[in-house]
Amino acid sequence: MKFLSRAALAVAVLWAGSAPASAQVQMIIPWPAGGGTDIIGRLIQPVFTEAMGTQVVIRNVGGATGTIGTAELVRAKPDGQTILLTSMAPIAIQPSFMARPPYRADQLTAVCLVAEAPATLMTPTTTGIRTVADIVARARVNPGQLPYASGGVGGLGHLAMTGLSRAFGIEMNHIPFRGSGDSVQAMLSGTVPMLTAEANLVKQYGLHAVAVFAQQRSPDFPETPTMREQGLDLVYPLWTGIFTAPGTPEAMVARMDEACARTLRTASVIEGMTRAGHPIRYLNRQEFAAYVRAEAEKYAKLIRDSGLRQAD
């Protein structure tokens, strides 16, 4: 039998005082199974369960670029029994992108940042695309025709490529899919030639990394240039974090944050996240809340400047 650590046991005792003995914590992942966020959730779930001292059960609620599952959290009771593990799109982008968003980013209660990696522009090795210059040249030959995939309308892949298109004054054809899992499969089948998504897909599927939307080159792809090296101020991190329902008592949020910190320090989680290509980056609840505000403001400006907001 595996015993709880002293720290985890302390959290379990505190949690027991504020939740029914039979309570489970439901972890909503607002994306289909098999995508990057789902992989992270299944890597951390066993250790997070131990750290919380109560069973954490994953439930995938995909659709509408993550907003269906996120809206479910916003409507949840503030009793600590529902949390959300999500990548950034439904939090930092969709409330500014949608004509009638079902929630505001500031309604969610930030718990912790779990992982962060640079968005990576990738393509199969058979397309002949090697550089950003290759993409620009093709787009200029047939304006509006060159397709690219994304994990959904208004997702980071969509916004990143919008920023790239604006920087070079080109038009491309956006083909949205239901999460990164579906979009990479479409690319592998030849439906679309490129995708901007999490970097781990490059090694997983033997793809070519064209560029990273980051301040510095990735240690995993030291030969791949950043957009900044090409004179473009396009820095778009792909981050994943945990949130809980609006109005959840601070004591509960603090305990979730403590459990998150311990989970991300656990050797098996570090090993699994590294192997899966999802670099851990922990921010506590206060730091993460400030980070989310800054990210939401950044993407709100890009959406305004690009005229991307959905019409009523």
Q: What residue ranges belong to the model's regions?
A:
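Hinge/capping helix and adjacent helix->loop/strand transition within the periplasmic-binding protein
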Residues: 25, 48, 75-81, 88, ...
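Stable alpha-helical elements in mature extracytoplasmic
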Residues: 36, 40, 44, 65, ...
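Short beta-strand->loop
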Residues: 103-113, 171-175, 199-202, 206-235, ...
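Mature extracytoplasmic/periplasmic domains
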Residues: 265, 270-289
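Bacterial N-terminal signal peptides
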Residues: 7-18
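Positively charged n-region of N-terminal signal peptides that target proteins for export
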Residues: 1-6
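N-terminal (or domain-start) structured segment
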Residues: 20-107, 145, 153, 168-205, ...
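Short alpha-helical functional segments enriched in proximate histidine and acidic residues
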Residues: 51, 263, 295, 302
